[in-house]
């Protein structure tokens, strides 16, 4: 795919939890807990205009869902700030210093005075209905590993509450994560390829990680990707779970926008008119149905209704992403707005146990060959679903709508809500402006000394090639490598090879290489009990509870003493000559002799 000719532009928003002693706006510890909560409370959110007199469209979208929110907390690690019953405390200075340090890494312009803002969030993940956020710096640019990275903004904000469960219209959150300091780095629009965007995301994430102030573990880093193409629209894709998924997410979003533009062109060519949200009851068409999907609704006292979609024949079933069709997009809207499980459409019928005869009956009753079927017991939900489907269909001729979408595990995306507007952000009235003091700058200078290039230089000085050093930095093994180098007198390059190459090769064979096995092998190498050539075979064959030395003895792979190596080399040199001796000795005694010992013995032989 020629992304440049398509006008692909991408942007990243990288969110990283900071490892601080307290939360951002209170003094509770930022720890996640799995024990039974001490209390639960219930809240409902209601729409109101912001201090600027406007209502955000994303707010209207969420509030219309009429949801009930339950919050779980702990008396010893949750306070009234999280419950929105006490004013927030002053921001954590440690978190602020880290944000300033990251700004310096990317040469961003710092604000002399930082104002705390409220960002409207009404999915229930913030008890107050807003997230507190501080814009720390803007307009940064840095060249790292050959990439020119423009940073639009660097913000410090509080993380949201943790979703525990969702049951119908009730969503259960836990307050332990609410308020954990989170740094957000938003890039300028980029014209890089999807694979290059993944690299940029890694660089940004590691630049924060290398400060030593970032939390580690699952869920501590979250990536949002903004994607647009010429003629399309800016789409924000939330929660890409893994860096390696970024290229696929971008590729599939480009496909989706291209396909939506094709659908728009076809609708214009057909001269399709407005879809009205009026419903036709077609329940009688399924009086004797064998479809389990339909029978389940009818047995619960529900009904089946049809929404006429004239002019959409063969377009409802048009693929927009792998395994996802335009009808799937409509079903996403229904699920996002209502409690209905989705919809069926004429392009996928007969199917789901619905017969061709039943389809003809529905078409006759609806008075249309193209239609959407909705099923349920709640009349209000059916009407809501019809309205949202009609609204999306009427927007289809205009091309790609601006949306916030969620990333699926396979790289496709689903609709979450409309893109938020400017009315989403307004000033926090409970916290005075925060000045960047000399003390904060001093702390930031210390943190900002770390860099990717600095870490590469440190690793290459140990004898690693630049490629191996970069591979190690990108792997999850860097900390382990540094610990092992400090503990064992083994060349760092050998340790890196075991962690990066040998372990991976054995894992492909189904061999589990534990930390204990690696430690035992390094101990044997340090004691000169085995050679580096024997490492893979020893790891492959180590039994449970067996040391590397014991395994090597059992396998006949104990390191040959140097005196024996000299004797062997003398014999081989006599037999095949000095030039061929190294290869011949290594072939005969592979795993038992060290190549450096053989080279030394050859150099010491004089006939």
Curated annotation (Swiss-Prot):
Residues 399-428 are annotated as: Disordered. Heterodimer of GatD and GatE. Its EC number is 6.3.5.-. The keyword S-adenosyl-L-methionine does not apply. Belongs to the GatB/GatE family. GatE subfamily. GO terms for biological process: glutaminyl-tRNAGln biosynthesis via transamidation; translation. Keywords: ATP-binding, Ligase, Nucleotide-binding, Protein biosynthesis. The keyword Transmembrane helix does not apply. It catalyses: L-glutamyl-tRNA(Gln) + L-glutamine + ATP + H2O = L-glutaminyl-tRNA(Gln) + L-glutamate + ADP + phosphate + H(+). It is an enzyme of class 6 (ligase). Allows the formation of correctly charged Gln-tRNA(Gln) through the transamidation of misacylated Glu-tRNA(Gln) in organisms which lack glutaminyl-tRNA synthetase. The reaction takes place in the presence of glutamine and ATP through an activated gamma-phospho-Glu-tRNA(Gln). The GatDE system is specific for glutamate and does not act on aspartate. This is Glutamyl-tRNA(Gln) amidotransferase subunit E. Gene3D superfamilies: GAD-like domain, GatB domain, N-terminal subdomain. One of its GO terms (cellular component) is cytoplasm. GO terms for molecular function: aminoacyl-tRNA ligase activity; ATP binding; glutaminyl-tRNA synthase (glutamine-hydrolyzing) activity.
